[in-house]
Amino acid sequence: MPVFNASDWLDECLQAILEQDFQGRMELCVFDDGSTDGSRELVERWRPKFEDRGISVLISGHKSSSPRGVGYAKNQAVSQSSGRFLCFQDADDVMKPQRVRLQQEAAAANPTAIVGCKVCRVPEGSTGRYTRWINSLSAEQLLTQVYTSHGPTVIMPSWFCSRSWFEKVGQFHEGGKGVPEDLLFFYQSLRLGGLVLRVDECLLVYRYHEHAATHSVLEQTIWDLRVDFLQERVLSQWDSFTIWNAGKQGRKLYRSLRPDNQSKVKAFCDVDENKIKKGFYTYEESKERPKPKIPVLHFRNASPPFIVCVKLDMTDGVLEGNLHSLQLTEGVHYYHFN
């Protein structure tokens, strides 16, 4: 558990760890990343309660005025631990009593998996679309929807994995503020053939607040990582494809691709008659002469495979209905990138 100025939430967080119904051996490993609000001392005061329950507590940290970042703090907490399994916990979240038990069972049966869980959001209703997405992905979509702007298909504060798998994937990136260390680790795990699983119960109360480290990561940083991973994992396997969305997001994806993948784009497709009437998209920034012109078609006249650049859960089911009407299989005929 990395900690940075979390005194407002620590009592509730620590009480929940104490109430785990897991019967095996547990240890709590905390790294304090330079808190100035007494967080480290607060954790220290809980030590006797944990030791009474047979849970050893390891606390380390630094007093530097500049935090080293979430990735560094997580790595330090892991390095001082000794367990065969790692349960990641954010200091502002609250685990349900059965979390460690159920996720440990899943990780023991799947030692190369990152195991997540469903979450309950606090305050209720905050980030509604994101929370619905996290909790409703199918087992297949945990692997096919890894390219969307939502990030990892099981959220980092719910992660649980074997120590051996963590060590194989390698540590979290320690670039500090602004680095999506969870996404980088997640992608590396997938590259190595790792599984993604979710225990289908709400095992974590996931708190939304304006100080969360998530807010420090730039959208463009995430975009660049997603585009690179899409090109590496999907587009490298395709000879040609269609971008579903002739609007801003679709054109941005096209412009972000390497030239060899731009040349594979045979068309854009859309439902907007105005865009379709224009007939084509001209890539004005191209150094090629003549400049590339890509046809814009109605989706019914376009051919798969597709990269879909339309936001999920924003069209009242119209997008999903259109994809279904073409009898397409996600992960074969199309991938979401939105």
From Swiss-Prot:
It comes from Danio rerio. Glycosyltransferase that specifically catalyzes galactosylation of cytoplasmic tRNA(Tyr) modified with queuosine at position 34 (queuosine(34)). Galactosylates the cyclopentene hydroxyl group of queuosine(34) in tRNA(Tyr) to form galactosyl-queuosine(34). Mannosylation of queuosine(34) in tRNA(Tyr) is required to slow-down elongation at cognate codons UAC and suppress stop codon readthrough, thereby regulating protein translation. It is found in: Cytoplasm. Disruption phenotype: Decreased postembryonic growth, characterized by shortened body length. GO terms for cellular component: cytoplasm. This is Queuosine-tRNA galactosyltransferase. One of its GO terms (molecular function) is tRNA-queuosine(34) galactosyltransferase activity. Keywords: Cytoplasm, Glycosyltransferase, Transferase. GO terms for biological process: regulation of translation; tRNA modification. Its EC number is 2.4.1.-. It holds the Pfam family Glycos_transf_2. PANTHER family: GLYCOSYLTRANSFERASE, UDP-GLCNAC:BETAGAL BETA-1,3-N-ACETYLGLUCOSAMINYLTRANSFERASE-LIKE PROTEIN 1.
